[in-house]
Amino acid sequence: HLCEDVEKDLGNALQCLNPNGAIVMHDCLPPNQYYQERTQSPHASGWTGDTWKAYMKFRATREDIEMCVVDTDYGCGVVRYGTQELVQLDLENDLIYDNLEKNKVEWLNLVSVDNFVERLQG
């Protein structure tokens, strides 16, 4: 649930991924700022950590993968080989919760469950 660990895990998983495979990441859409703190907050009934920051680093730097977050269960990120338009971010300064909240649809490529199912069937 910590950005640096998730970033390492995702990078390693991509090296092993079958060309037609997919990686599913949990906890990419924290419901409030307390959920995304690096240690579990007493103000939140759950914890996503800052997983979303690792996801965003790949959205901002990897054109060779396709990514979206399905709007369910604190955000399920789906990563597979393909292409994506990079999100323009200052990785040192932009990755704060308020920015995520304002830009989550664009930044995460956030899709509904129904839209995701349509993509799979299409």
Outline where the language-model segments fall.
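A short alpha-helical cap/connector motif
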Residues: 1-122
